[in-house]
Design a protein with these regions (language model features):
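Cyclic nucleotide-binding regulatory module and flanking cytosolic helices
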Residues: 1-18
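N-terminal regulatory/effector-sensing and dimerization cores
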Residues: 20-103
């Protein structure tokens, strides 16, 4: 599994720009963030995300969730969160693939 994640991470790093990059596949996006980012309030729409590299922390109410390479995040409904990228750099950016779920 680690090799599959590493291969996906290498592909996303090559194919994506900083931030969100759309793909030819509907509802599929590539994320690349090359620096740590402090807490940002967001509303996640229904989505499934696979973290490929780096680390992201989400605060949902009183819960703090940490996502690293190989972890998945699923939101089945609109979800207000505070998110921050806690592990990312220019040489080793935070990378993820997301699939928006039609509601």
């Amino acid at each position: 599994m680690d090799q599959v994640i590493a291969e996906l991470a290498a592909t996303v790093a090559r194919k994506s720009e900083e931030g969100l990059t759309a793909t030819p596949m509907p509802n599929v996006g590539l994320y690349k963030v090359s620096r740590c980012i402090d807490l940002l309030p967001e509303t996640y729409r229904p989505v499934v995300s696979l973290i490929l590299q780096g680390e992201k922390q989400l605060s949902i109410g009183d819960e703090i969730l940490i996502y690293r390479a190989g972890h998945t995040f699923t939101a089945a409904l609109d979800l207000p969160v505070l998110g921050k990228i806690t592990e990312a750099s220019a040489s080793r950016p935070y990378l993820a693939i997301s699939l928006a779920i039609a509601s």
